[in-house]
A protein has these predicted regions:
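Ligand-binding clefts of soluble mixed alpha/beta catalytic domains
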Residues: 1-544
Length: 544
């Protein structure tokens, strides 16, 4: 675990450099703060910024020089005591231009503002769409244009939007400030126009400078596009703090919270309780007990459906319902086979850890319904290899039990949060609130893996397919060639299992130290508490 944590810290430091130290120094020479410095200055002193999508773009676009953190810093932070979503373009990465992952990350930030009814602050410093990849950024539903659709929807929802133009704001991006409730600009460095001086010259032959075309004075004194101008970054950020300070409160969801308490058991023991060998059984309850307040857990049906742990607890004072994979082998009582058995007799079945059995799916579905009934946020803890397979499972109705679990989870109206601590494979990812099921936050530990199946299983399957294909072409393959091919396939597949591979594509919001889990979940519930539940809980047509 320590090696994984060291790697996490190294990757974090590297990614936070954005376009590199020279580019950061260039920002300062222009009299500008960097994106991360702007965020740090903006949020309340002694508060922490909960970064979302730090590793977005990691390993992508190498042929274009890379796009660290997607070229934009996003997350949750307190501004004048108000929890806000913050979006800050990083001008050290291709002048803040939009890559495909930049669009995805910006839309994720707006999604968080919409679903949690949180004010959103845009610190704009972007050259617009990255033209070499414009076909992947411009025209589709979840591309650049979706941002302005979301601007309009956020406004209609009554969610406060504040935009500060602190650098370039060009082309379609110029609509963002004026579609926000408050639009500010920094003199000398901020500029906003549909077409810059070069494009204006080539299009209509007009020679005009950036300040005349779209500088602070022009837009505050002539066009009226911008509300107010400020001499530097800090004074502009101070103005944003004053805006938030005077903003009224909104109704809350009313989730239960009491005075927070730390776990009574040592949370650092998680590092040793989670085995390095991911097939080795362990007791997930020991992990849960080191994440929850007072290490106090009220189990739901503890003797039934034991391959899933369900129960009530508190995290940083917030009441939560926890659904987690049990990773140890459990001895379960099941219905005895018909014929010769006494009425009511039960048989014993050994159930493998990390596998969802029919009885566990049935239990979890009912538990999720109870949490919706009682307005308790749900926390899913994944270390899952999938659902049980085989004739016994099929005859027992594993498909309908799994469908019941998915229906209850997918239709939940209480906020959901997902923590991937180990494996997250196949349908198990779906059933325990993977990204497709709208968790408010989805975080991964460095020990996480996400894929359709494990690397070993996938490699063997892919090997069989490739060997059969070669033989169909009349080619022969020696045992040595087969082993080399297996190793190549395994290496390729294992690279895709990494939590950083998932984080680079925003399949998870963050890769975190396990000790940061409570902070992420608590802040996530605090955010969700700003959005009252207005939709009735209805699971629809559910199989029984």
């Amino acid at each position: 675990m320590q090696l994984l944590l060291d790697n996490l810290n190294q990757q974090t430091v590297r990614t936070q450099l954005g376009g590199g130290q020279k580019k950061l120094d260039d920002q300062h020479k222009k009299g500008k703060l960097t994106a991360r410095e702007r965020v740090t200055y903006l949020i309340d002193p002694d508060s922490e910024f909960l970064e979302i999508g730090l590793f977005a773009g990691d390993g992508l676009y190498a042929e274009h020089g890379g796009c660290p953190s997607g070229g934009v810093v996003t997350g949750l932070g307190y501004v004048s005591g108000r929890l806000c979503v913050i979006v800050a373009n990083d001008a050290t990465v291709k002048a803040g231009a939009w890559f495909p992952i930049t669009a995805k990350k910006n839309l994720r930030a707006q999604e968080m503002a919409m679903e949690n009814h949180l004010p959103i602050i845009y610190l704009v410093d972007s050259a617009g769409v990255y033209l070499p990849l414009q076909d992947e950024v411009f025209a589709d539903k979840d591309h650049f244009g979706r941002m302005f659709r979301n601007n309009a929807h956020l406004s209609a929802m009554g969610v406060l939007q504040v935009a500060a133009v602190m650098g370039s704001c060009v082309a379609g991006g110029a609509y963002l400030p004026i579609m926000s409730d408050e639009a500010l600009i920094v003199e000398g460095t901020g500029s906003i126009f549909l077409a810059g001086p070069y494009l204006v010259k080539s299009s209509i032959g007009e020679d005009v400078g950036a300040e005349t075309l779209g500088g602070a004075a022009m837009h505050t004194e002539i066009s009226g596009v911008i509300d107010n101008k400020f001499p530097d970054d800090k004074s502009c950020l101070d103005a944003i703090r004053r805006i938030l300070d005077k903003t009224g409160s909104q109704p809350l969801a009313g989730f239960s919270r009491v005075t927070p308490a730390l776990p009574t058991l040592d949370s650092t023991e998680i590092y040793t309780l989670l085995p390095q060998d991911r097939v080795k059984p362990y007791d997930m309850q020991t992990i849960i007990d080191r994440l929850i307040d007072n290490s106090e857990f009220d189990p739901y049906k503890p003797d039934y459906g034991q391959s899933l742990i369900c129960g009530y607890a508190r995290i940083d004072g917030w009441a939560v319902g926890i659904v987690a994979n049990q990773r140890k082998v459990v001895k379960a009582k099941v219905r005895a086979a018909l014929g010769g058995s006494a009425p009511g007799a039960a048989a014993t079945e050994m159930q493998m850890g990390g596998v969802i059995y029919g009885d566990a799916a049935d239990k979890a579905a009912r538990f999720i319904m109870n949490c919706n009934q009682k307005k308790i946020p749900l926390v899913f803890i994944q270390d899952v290899t999938g659902f049980m397979v085989g004739s016994r499972a099929e005859q027992g109705g594993i498909i309908k039990d799994g469908a019941k679990l998915v229906s209850a989870m997918a239709n939940s109206v209480v906020p959901k949060f997902t923590i991937v601590v180990g494996n997250s494979y196949g349908a198990g990812n779906y059933a325990l609130c993977g990204r497709a099921y709208d968790p408010r936050l989805m975080i991964a530990w460095p020990t996480a893996q996400m894929a359709v199946m494990s690397g070993a299983s996938a490699a063997k399957t892919l090997l069989q397919i490739q060997v059969a294909s070669l033989k169909a072409k009349g080619e022969t393959i020696t045992p040595e060639d087969e082993q080399a091919l297996l190793q190549k396939i395994t290496d390729q597949y294992n690279a895709q299992l990494s939590p950083y591979y998932a984080a680079a594509r925003l399949w998870v919001d963050a890769v975190i130290d396990p000790l940061d889990t409570r902070r992420y979940i608590s802040t996530g519930i605090e955010a969700a508490n700003h959005a009252p539940i207005t939709k009735a809980f209805n699971v629809g047509n559910i199989q029984t």
